[in-house]
């Protein structure tokens, strides 16, 4: 009887261990681990502040609030923006995203987040992207010369 009880306990422990591993794998998938273009899919609101540094003259402050739609396939478009450059406000109309693209890669070790790049057009502006595994927020920094400009894009809808 003792032997039967021991075998039953061992079998139960093994079964629980196996189901725990299966659940961990399932949870990992739910968190969106692993980076791909589809990590960014939906409408985001981007808000950033910083400065542009002209070739001559002092640095000028700039800020933007912009709608960005990531299509989950490496393409994106802007649904419009408001920009302030040295206190001059401009409304920027929506664009169809022609020439706009982004790329994404896993950080090392995988599962810790993603890193990517974004180009609004062939001539810029260009950004480096830092993305948590679920892609709900994106930290962005402009990489064009003579710019000190960074902000966050937050997912607002799919």
Q: Where are the language model's segments positioned?
A:
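Mature soluble binding/inhibitory domains
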Residues: 23-158
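Bacterial N-terminal signal peptides that target proteins for export
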Residues: 1-10
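Bacterial N-terminal signal peptides
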Residues: 11-17
């Amino acid at each position: 009887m003792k032997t039967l009880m021991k075998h039953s306990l061992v079998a139960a422990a093994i079964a629980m261990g196996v189901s725990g591993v299966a659940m961990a794998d399932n949870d990992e998938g739910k968190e969106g681990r692993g980076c791909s273009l589809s990590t960014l899919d939906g409408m985001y609101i981007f808000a950033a502040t910083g400065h542009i540094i002209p070739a001559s003259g002092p640095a000028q402050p700039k800020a933007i609030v912009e709608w960005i739609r990531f299509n989950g396939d490496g393409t994106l478009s802007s649904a419009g923006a408001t920009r302030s450059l040295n206190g001059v406000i401009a409304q920027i109309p929506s664009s169809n995203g022609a020439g706009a693209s982004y790329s994404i890669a896993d950080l090392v070790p995988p599962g810790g987040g993603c890193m990517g790049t974004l180009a609004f057009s062939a001539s810029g502006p260009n950004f480096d992207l830092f993305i948590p595994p679920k892609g709900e927020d994106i930290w962005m920094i402009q990489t064009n010369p003579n710019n000190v400009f960074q902000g966050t894009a937050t997912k607002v809808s799919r």
